[in-house]
Regions:
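Short, basic, alpha-helical segments at the C-terminal edge of helix-turn-helix-like DNA-binding modules
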Residues: 183-192, 230
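Short, Lys/Arg-enriched N-terminal segment that forms or immediately precedes the first helix
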Residues: 8-11, 120-128, 168-175
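N-terminal regulatory/effector-sensing and dimerization cores
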Residues: 1-83
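Sequence-specific DNA-binding recognition helix
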Residues: 195-230
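Amphipathic alpha-helical segments enriched in hydrophobic/aromatic and basic residues
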Residues: 178-183, 224-228
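DNA-binding recognition helix and immediately preceding turn/loop
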Residues: 132-178, 197-208
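Short hydrophobic/aromatic patch on the recognition helix
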Residues: 46, 167, 171, 215-216, ...
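Amphipathic alpha-helical segments enriched in hydrophobic/aromatic residues interleaved with Lys/Arg
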Residues: 77-144
Length: 230
């Protein structure tokens, strides 16, 4: 087992590459698209992706991102990109290991992490059915840069080069969800990140565009009860 950390600036694009063994990618913060020929997954903060061995892929960074990359050679990663469920234990392990230096304790945590990853089930996620349309990409980049519940598709369409109707179609065809479903996932991912940084929920609600704290509280509590995914 090998655990690495990567930090990618907004707008970065890795070259097409593959790995000898399966790779788990956990996104601590940020947002981006992992794509291979004909398919891809859209990752937001708090999500986990499994990349099979030998699958050529690239990572397009929509927002400054920090990732944990785990390589498990003795795992059957299947043949396709998949989103995996993220339990509270996995979140805690990834976050704790990010600053852990003591070798003995770190090895113990890695053993638990490997065991959890081997049994984590598949989850629903934002799967890209084809190459990402550049007009949709502009919308994804804007919302990932500054997550807010206040974004409306009419506002975003003005800078995307597409009509609201076209963007609705692209969300449905390429992500399999509505704009509102995707926006909510991005906003709640950012909320989880800010909470882990110790910020009070009232401040988080304001930063994410909620004028009604009770509406934010309801959405956030529902998010915490569900595995990371749409």
């Amino acid at each position: 087992m090998n655990l690495l950390y990567r930090d990618y600036p907004q707008g970065a694009l890795t070259s097409l590459h593959c790995h000898e063994g399966p790779q788990f990618c956990y996104l601590h913060r940020g947002g981006g698209v992992i794509s291979s020929e004909g398919t891809g997954v859209l990752l937001v903060a708090g999500q986990l992706c499994l990349i099979p061995a030998g699958l050529a892929h690239e990572f397009r960074v929509l927002r400054h991102s920090q990732l944990s990359l785990v390589y498990l050679d003795d795992l059957d990663g299947g043949g396709e990109l998949t989103i995996r469920q993220v339990s509270p234990l996995l979140v805690g392990l990834f976050d704790r290991l990010a600053d852990m230096a003591e070798p003995g304790l770190r090895d113990a945590y890695l053993t638990v992490l490997a065991a959890e990853l081997r049994q984590t089930p598949a989850a629903t996620g934002f799967m890209l059915s084809a190459g990402l349309d550049v007009r949709l990409l502009r919308v994804l980049e804007q919302v990932c840069r500054h997550p807010s519940i206040e974004y409306g598709l009419a506002e975003l369409a003005a800078g995307s080069g597409a009509s609201v109707r076209t963007l609705n179609r692209l969300f449905s065809q390429q992500l399999g969800c509505s704009f509102r479903q995707w926006r909510q996932q991005v906003v709640m991912g950012r909320a989880r990140q800010l909470q882990q940084q110790g910020q009070p929920l009232s401040r988080i609600a304001l930063e994410l565009g909620y004028g009604d704290f009770s509406a934010f509280s309801h959405a956030f509590n529902r998010c915490l009860r569900e595995p990371a995914g749409p």
